[in-house]
Structures are given as C-alpha cells and as structure tokens.
C-alpha cells in the first residue's frame, strides 16, 4: 500500500464502519446479530495496513451469519457503487482533520515525525508533508473513478489474508482474580 491508499482506507473505514449512514453498519445492526458494529483502519509508517471489523454484544454462534451478511453487503456496495453524499461527507471530514492537524501547536514535531517515518522506509520524506495533492487525488479518484468500490472488491472481498477472531468473556475470571 502507499500513502494514497492509506488515506483512502481511512475514509473508507469511516464510510463502511463508523458512519450512521453506512448501509453495511445499518444492515448488520438491524439483523439483530449484535448490539453494535464498528471497525477501524490501522496503518504504519511503512504503509502496512490492517482493516478491523468488530461486533459488540454478539455471540460466537453468529459468526457465519455475520460473515455472510458482511460479504454480501460489501459485494452489493461494490457492485452498485457507494452513495456519493456519504462519500463527500466522509471526504470532507477527512480533509478537515488533515487541515486541523496542520494547525496544532506542535506542528513542527508532527512534520518531523511524518518525514522521518517516510525516510526510514526509503520513501520521499517531503512527499509525506504534501497534503494538497493527496487530498485532491483522493477526492477525484473516489468520486470519478470508483476507487473505493475497487478497494472494497480487491482488498476486502478478494483478500486471502483474512482472519476471524472470537473473543468471549470468561465468567469465572473475576472471581478467580479476586481470590
């Protein structure tokens, strides 16, 4: 992944997992298999990416139903296209956050951190500081080239490096640690 796709995944994670207007989030919550649904995107300075989705208030027995609904809904979103108003809203939010970060008091330290991380992995340290080109390219690709839909298909649906993890509480753990 590169800087452009990292930025795209940040916006896409909000569209898919965190926005109240997300068809994916709304379908999963309305299905009754969980109380809440969310997800996040993690990246490193060397552009390694992880997309994580989670259910809150669900049971392990709902894993297959969740996986089927998740994949069907992502496929539908990728085939039919994402809602342009939702994309514009999340792109605006991302752009606002990027510009807001540029006005922080410790801006110099942030710039050094961004450029050093890029330099460390043999990337252009100055490219990491240029946001205008990043923002305009992201907006153009998302709204004119079905970029987010392609990412959903290639990186989420057709990705062989997918892991499913179930975390269940141990009801006796509190009593055990208190003893």
Predicted feature locations:
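M16 family metallopeptidases and their MPP-like homologs
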Residues: 1, 25-141, 160-178
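Core subunits and conserved enzymes of cellular information-processing
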Residues: 152-155
């Amino acid at each position: 992944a590169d800087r452009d796709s990292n930025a795209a995944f940040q916006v896409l994670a909000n569209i898919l997992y965190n926005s109240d207007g997300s068809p994916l989030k709304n379908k999963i919550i309305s299905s009754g298999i969980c109380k809440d649904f969310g997800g996040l995107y993690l990246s490193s300075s060397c552009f390694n990416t992880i997309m994580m989705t989670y259910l809150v208030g669900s049971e392990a027995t709902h894993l297959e139903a969740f996986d089927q609904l998740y994949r069907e809904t992502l496929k539908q979103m990728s085939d039919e296209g994402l809602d342009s108003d939702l994309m514009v809203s999340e792109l605006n939010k991302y752009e606002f956050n990027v510009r807001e970060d540029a006005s922080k008091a410790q801006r110099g330290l942030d710039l050094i951190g961004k450029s050093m991380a890029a330099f460390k992995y043999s990337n252009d340290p100055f490219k990491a500081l240029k946001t205008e080109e990043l923002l305009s390219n992201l907006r153009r690709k998302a709204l004119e080239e079905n970029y987010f839909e392609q990412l959903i298909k290639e990186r989420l649906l057709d990705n062989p490096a997918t892991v499913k993890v179930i975390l269940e509480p141990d009801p006796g753990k509190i009593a055990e640690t208190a003893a």
